[in-house]
Curated annotation (Swiss-Prot):
Highest taxon of source: Bacteria
Protein name in the entry: Lysine--tRNA ligase
Protein location: Cytoplasm
GO biological process: lysyl-tRNA aminoacylation
Description of how the protein assembles with itself and partners: Homodimer.
Cofactor info, note text: Binds 3 Mg(2+) ions per subunit.
This protein's encoding gene: lysS
Family as reported in the entry's similarity comment: Belongs to the class-II aminoacyl-tRNA synthetase family.
Amino acid sequence: MTDAVQNEINQEQIAQEENKLIAERRSKLDHIRKNCKANGHPNSFRRDSLAGDLQKKFGEKSKEELEALNHVVSIAGRVMAKRGPFLVIQETSGRIQAYASKEVQQELKDKYQGLDIGDIIGVQGALHKSGKGDLYVNMEQFQLLTKALRPLPEKFHGLTDQEMRYRQRYVDLIVNENSRNAFIVRSKVMSAIRNFMISKQFMEVETPMMHVIPGGASARPFITHHNALDMPMYLRIAPELYLKRLVVGGFDRVFEINRNFRNEGLSPRHNPEFTMMEFYMAYADYKDLMDLTEELLSSVALEVLGSTSMPYGEHTVEFGGKYARMSMFDAIKHYNPNHAQIQALTEEDIQNRDLMVSIAKSVHVDVEPFWTCGQLLEEIFGETAEPKLMQPTFITGYPADISPLARRSDDNPFFTDRFEFFIGGREVANGFSELNDAEDQDARFKAQVEAKESGDDEAMFYDADYITALEHGLPPTAGQGIGIDRLVMLLTNTHTIRDVILFPAMRPQQ
């Protein structure tokens, strides 16, 4: 018998067992509907305590002290285990046990034909402590609030299918503590970032999610249709151009935490729908952004995790202190010490396309015919240097031809005052001194249009209204985007973006 045939037989047996369990639970629900009020789904129980709060308040008290207190609580949650007369009840803050005397057990059997793992129950009773030192509630009153018709995965085969964890995130959250903790951390990260930005006098704003002209990043957009206006529209790939319009309008410090959409591939680092925090500050440059980023990330790590040092894979990442700063050109040289062509490369050579194509191919980059010298430099960097940037590092010196919205460097106009921030071998943030020269921006938009016509699907569109806004005057401004999903991956020691997005994009199940 082949492994494939055996696996098919096993899956069929699992399905049969699951269907049997579901049928038994439906039979119990029929009994409950006939014998209980509210058609078996009451909505009158009110809890007054959470397991986590009870542990903090009473966890250090002795068994005798709790008996003397006779503190009555009402708890509610999902039955996760049955251990003799004890039920393990799980809710948002943690777990607590409930003790069912023989009389209560008989009443549960008569009323509900017994409880199953996954049922949601409300319990009222005095708080006690077991001989092992565990808190529990003595079940004096109880109510089955929701009958679970499907067994939890570990009841029949365990939640081992990674894809099923993403498709049925609700089940994953019930049975997987690591998943729950990751999304608790995510929520805290969002709150910490928001509070930090507000403390720095940034105003939170909301800009359109549907754009007439997609812009603010180099990416392929999703296209939709506005029925009332009878016109195509695009889900936003970035809020940048709208946020900078607000700076033109006089809001000197703005930020937005929201979703972006890019019609591109799926990977451990990419999801078509993702969360970004973008912010813009007038009268600042890209160096100010790097300083602010150091302060922001160390503050968030300390607030959320209680430390600026944390594990990531085999490494320990340090969010505190000053971060390394290195130009893209220098990083390529640093991480390719034995590549003769790269070691001989000068900044002037970067503009020699034939040479850059040769180097790119030598490091296994699949070169597109429409790539510019700047794109070739970035691809060489991405292939040979980026994966090695484990500790927080700002990479500066991005060429202008791949930075259409960034201000040119005063020292060398081939480059821009731009950086990308890397940690854990991946990009987490992108920032630069904004291009506020309307005529230069006009020329760069036109160059992007030419690139799009040459086959670059990710090149930007021409945005005439944004040029008009710049012609009204954008003050010297710096702006940055931070990928929330990738940041949470780092803070939770997670290596795929799907583990930090509650409902990631998936193909329909066959």
